[in-house]
Amino acid sequence: VEEKSSGVGSLKALQPLLGDDTTVSAEVEILGSRMVLGRVVEKLKLDIVAVPKTFPLVGGTIARRYVGAEPNQPVFGLDSYAWGGEAIQIDSLDVPKDYLDDPLELIAGDNGTYAIIDVDKQTVLQGAVGVRANNKGFSAFVVQLKARPGTHFRLTRRSAESAIDAIRSQYAVKERGKKSGVLELSLLGGDAAQINLILDEILNTYVRQNVERRS
């Protein structure tokens, strides 16, 4: 496997056991299949989206450039936005079917507490880091939350279909050159580490599936 990455995308090359053009085409299909990508979504929990809510236009740039150990102080007094140094990790998130793919927001509280609100600003769940929270079909297990109290995070529980489609919209597989037998996998995005993690898991899943097919 060869790889080349940057802040906006990553490229990896794979030379599987390919015999002819038909096999190459079949392997390309497998690498982009719902079976492979679905396993990647499940393994990496890509159906859970949780990112700091930054101020439009300039907020993202300010947050990316911040290098302090603790969350940055709010700019312009806008303390509901994230200004850098925030972190969140959610191990599990379940919502009622009607809320799949709908935007939610998680608001950090004091001492590791949080509240989740829906688009109508209604609180649907309250909890604390390290403790599973449940309420009327909503369930969450937050394992890390680093933010000033009052900071908002964008939160979405994607359906499997939309999580797979999100990968496919930025993902491509093709043969490098003509009859080379080398497949190139590329993925675009804003987080180089996350991109490489996804591509690595696609490759690992593909290899495992090949082993299963041949056993």
Language model segments and positions:
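Solvent-exposed coil/turn segments that connect beta secondary-structure elements
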Residues: E2-S6, R34-V36, K43-L46, N111, ...
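A short, surface-exposed, charged and often Trp/Pro-enriched helix-loop connector in the C-terminal portion
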Residues: T22-T23, R176, V182-L183, G190, ...
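Soluble non-cytosolic domains of exported or imported proteins
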Residues: L18-M35, G189-A193
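Alpha-helical transmembrane helix bundles of large polytopic membrane transport and channel proteins
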Residues: L37-Q144, R148
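Solvent-exposed, non-transmembrane alpha-helical starts
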Residues: V8, N196-L197
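Short, glycine-rich, amphipathic interfacial segments at transmembrane boundaries or analogous
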Residues: V1-T23, I116, V124
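Extracytoplasmic
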Residues: G9, T23-A26, M35, Y99-P103, ...
